[in-house]
Amino acid sequence: MSDRCKIYYQSLYLFVKIFIKSKLIPKNFVTDSGLDSSSPIFYILPSRSKMDLIILREESLKQGLPDPLTPLKVDEIQIPRYLFIDDIKESHGHSPSSAETLFSRYLGLYSKNSTLDITILPVSVMIGRRPISICQNRKINRLQKFFTAFWLGRDSFVHFSNPISLSRIINAHSKDLRIVYKLARVARIHFFRQYLSSVGRALPVHSDLFKKLLSSEAIEKALLDEARSKKISPQKAHDNALRLMKEIASQVSYETIRLSDRVLGWMWNRFYQGIHVHNADCVRQLAYKGHSIVYVPCHRSHMDYLLLSYVLYYEGLATPHIAAGINLNFWPAGAIFRRLGAFFIRRNFKGNKLYSTIFRAYLDELFTGGYPVEYFIEGGRSRTGLLLEPKTGTLSMTIQAMLRDISPSITLIPVYIGYEHVIEVLSYTKELRGERKKKENFFQMIGGLRQLRHLGQGYVNFGEPIQLKLYLDKNVPDWRESIRPINKIEATRPHWLASTVKDLAYQIMININHAAAINAINLCSTALLASENQALTRPELLEQLNCYLQLMRHAPHNQYSSVTDQMPEELLDHALHMNKFVVQKNHPHERICLPKEQVPLMRYYRNNIQHLLILPSLIATTVLCHHNISRQEIIRQITLLYPVFKIRWFLYYSEKQLLEALNLLMDELIRQKCVENKNHHFVVNLSSGMMTLKILASGIKEILQHYSIIFFLLTVYPDIDRKSLEKESRAMAKHLCILENMPSAEFFHSSIFSGLLTLLFEKREKMVSNDYSAQKNIEEIFNILKGLISSQMISVMQENFSLKKEWLTYKKKTTD
């Protein structure tokens, strides 16, 4: 190497050291991929760049991988360890390029030694992530590269793709050199998709986008209808449409995203003790394959918008366009959110055809353009910590967009977002007690920022993806008959759409719940809320935490949820550090208590994971209430109850999977010595498992009471409608709350019964057993529930019903 070259490389090394700070994608690539760093590794990169090569060298050495600038030595032969794909061009009879010659040398090595297995490692280096137009050339000259690295070098990523075995390629395609060209074509497509999945496409500027939308047939017709119905001029209708487009459309700014990355990075590090991400690689692979990704997260907090975008950015994925409620479009948050990708949606479209047409057209533009999109299927934030009944409007538009343009392969990604501390939880409990929701504004935002401390850990779990085309193929085999050209005016509303959207929304909710994150706060809250007087000694609480952890780790397996790998002692110490519990030391053992004022708040965190413990809690309750019961009878009773619980709690198991899950859970409770199996009958293990089993069972006490109220009323009023049933259920729950001295406003809150009853009535036919009529099935379910709740509660319900019946009889007589 000449002195001039040495000076150039040394200068480049120094520049990279000072100005480049790269992040590895995926974060734990070497361990997750199972790559053997001692094996011969050959790097391929998209395009010729010495700077990219040096950045790759720095990252490779950090990860313990071979230096790409050190030649590969095999049988005393030295060959360069890297190749640029853009150097491979089909020669068509001309002399082969140096890249082709290099690849042929690798083929020659294999022909001499067939046991040699060289690993091809595709790598792309990305400096900055400014979205580009699809027709824009990504190649830049050296000077442009220098200034890009100088300005954006701290925002660099090194993407390692899945390793490829050279021997497998040769065995599959022989040693024909033409395979080089095929590999180059495949690699170019892969690198381009990887680039798009990380950076995303740039939306047209507002003026061009609005012009395109206004020229569509659907909006032109809506403008004519607007002018005619409101008796205004076409120009006025046109101005109204522009105003609505400006209200809706996002205005993504890469510089704002880059700045927010710095601010959010500082905030997460200062106020959170860690952000845990699970199953992101599945999403990344789908994006690399060209899928149009739609993120469908649960909604716990306003922090969800920021957290998910931040996580995606750090996972090397393009930040999505986010459907945000119009209530967040206040100064200055609205403008910031808009630049971060938010587009704003009104709560209600009814009566405003122009708005709904424009919003649908804007959403179509996002879907057909392949932009990642995010919307909250619950519509609003959950005040109880439970998943809300899904809102299906935007989901329906997603399917309709695909029916207008089948080309994008849309995949829905359910996302579970969890926190150890939700900053709005205090206001949620106030709203449950009847206080009015405060309107979001600048001063409320400042007040919220003041609460940013001791936030614990955050969790983002990506659930099982749902590929729309595959889902429709399975559930609506003839759906392709409903596809029509994109320039048609009317929205596509095939006869199957409404029912399919409802079922799909329900499946999304199941997949969100199935990806739950288990942490110290929700586990400790679950145990203490289920205990007598909301207090346990330290050994008792540790025993209960261990029971929960073992149940979730051993039976049944779930690849989408995340269970902490910490020991119960570590979990408890962390939970106590969060200052949500009180430790009483004037006791033989430390006593951990929930202060009275914390009880409503802790219900929120308990509710986040309660669905994961429904089945083991049902088993525990059944064993405790029946004292001596066969495995078959436990399975029979829970199988009858399961459809009712599945509906509201969005439980994952099908009827076929349920039997296996129940057997695994029962075996686990035997292994933990909570129950004993005597002559094929289950009894409580009085010597060691009584208290653990009682607390486990107590976790669903309120749920069983809710269901008992509903099914009691369904047995005495067979023809009752949904609205009346909700009213009567709430009244009876309130009455029981007073008699049983239960202070929880959540027990009889309208949101509990409203969502539950809506889903029950929608899925009523799925509750019916093959052996029973609908009413007989309801009576059988109530008979099982009667055996699982206190006889005192049954007496109170019957007495309440008798008094009401007498009152109605008396009222009728006096009226007559």
UniProtKB/Swiss-Prot annotation:
List the membrane topology term(s).
Peripheral membrane protein
Q: Main location per UniProt?
A: membrane
- Give residue numbers for sequence motif HXXXXD motif: 298-303
Disulfide-linked positions: none
**GO annotation, cellular component aspect:** plasma membrane
Q: Which GO terms describe its biological process?
A: CDP-diacylglycerol biosynthetic process; fatty acid metabolic process
UniProt pathway annotation:
Phospholipid metabolism; CDP-diacylglycerol biosynthesis; CDP-diacylglycerol from sn-glycerol 3-phosphate: step 1/3
Protein name as annotated: Glycerol-3-phosphate acyltransferase
What species is given as this protein's source?
A: Hamiltonella defensa subsp. Acyrthosiphon pisum (strain 5AT)
